[in-house]
């Protein structure tokens, strides 16, 4: 099953974040889509923004990110 890593409600949209370490933003986005995280928030009637972020533990920075609306 799994859970989305972070949810942010701006009042105008719901942002679903999946965070990865030393993988890829694409892997994070794939998890959001494969586990159908947006369906869990359908009753909010807010637009869903999916955000996948990959962190690099060597440089301690965001390596890449991907956003889908």
Predicted segments with their positions:
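Generic hydrophobic, helix-prone segments enriched in Leu/Val/Ile
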Residues: 9-10, 28, 37, 62
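Intrinsically disordered, low-complexity acidic/polar segments
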Residues: 15, 26-28, 44, 59-62
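Mg2+/Mn2+-dependent nuclease catalytic core
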Residues: 21-38
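Flexible, glycine/threonine-enriched loop-and-boundary segments that flank and lead into catalytic domains
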Residues: 1-2
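Conserved catalytic cores of phosphodiester-cleaving nucleases, focusing on short active-site segments
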Residues: 6-21, 35
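Domain-level recognition of nuclease-like catalytic cores that cleave nucleotide substrates
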Residues: 40, 46-69
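C-terminal structured domain segments across diverse proteins
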Residues: 17, 31, 49-51
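Short, flexible, glycine/charge-rich loop motifs used to bind or transfer phosphoryl groups or to couple energy/partner
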Residues: 5, 39-41
